[in-house]
Amino acid sequence: MMKDLDKLAVAIIGSGNIGTDLMIKVLRHAKHLDVAAMVGIDPASDGLARAARLGVPTTAGGIDGLVAMPGFADVRIAFDATSAGAHARHAEVLGRHGVQVIDLTPAAIGPFVVPVVNLFEHLDAPNLNMVTCGGQATIPIVHAVSRVAPVHYAEIVASISSRSAGPGTRANIDEFTETTSKAIETVGGAARGKAIIVLNPAEPPLMMRDTVYCLTDEDADTAAIEHSIRTMVDAVASYVPGYRLKQAVQFDRYTAAQPLAFDAGERRAGLKVSVFLEVEGAAHYLPSYAGNLDIMTSAALAAAEQIAASRVAA
């Protein structure tokens, strides 16, 4: 049941690490959202138990259990924090009931959304896909370069702690690379994109690290590129406080006589831009090294807050 006329009722599907962290973020920080349901499939999950302790209505009956809940009619937005495979049915069921979906899986049924880049283009989309953790961290940087210089090729490497990669993340590795690569192009603005994910087994666990390489024109303006990148980092940090540059932006020029070799041996002259990022989690529910999960929940919350704010204002 909706508790506040200035808030939209939301449901969170998936009571694992991502869903539980998202629930805590909404409860603590959301101005326009009210958690109406936490949905899982394991009655013994910590996420459902924690939700119940916090007074959030719960069901272990999955999507069908959600639809059967007394407060479901009030739900306007549903976050799906399950898996790409499960999302198709969830999207179909929720769509029938007119519930807008924010998809935190790599299913990519709806348009790719990175809040600082293109959220306002998709506020009314029935299904918004939040790409991947690597996408949320790196696509803003690709876009920052592409808005001041053409990006002929962009490659990102997302390195995350093995301990932060649960069964859902591990099951979706292929979807991660495919979805992120596409979004580097369609959202980031690169002519071609490539994504790589590395699960780092180091102990103690390391924070999420992301490397972004962009190949642009040889005579591109380095000062304009660096300014655009730093402005973008500040914009992302406004909703992911642990997001930061790890070191200065690096530039390397390659001439026709000494071209850059990349992506299966292709060679090209140009300016290579290298950006090194670190993402520290807020440690609401997950440990601080799990920045890869924190950036997903933070981006999803930012998207939902803006959607809700636009509806409340209307």
Curated annotation (Swiss-Prot):
SUPFAM superfamilies from the xrefs? Glyceraldehyde-3-phosphate dehydrogenase-like, C-terminal domain (SSF55347), NAD(P)-binding Rossmann-fold domains (SSF51735)
Leading EC class: oxidoreductase
Q: What is its EC number?
A: 1.2.1.10
What is the protein named? Acetaldehyde dehydrogenase 4
- Signal sequence, start to end: none
Where does the record place the catalytic residues? C133
Keywords, ordered alphabetically: Aromatic hydrocarbons catabolism, NAD, Oxidoreductase
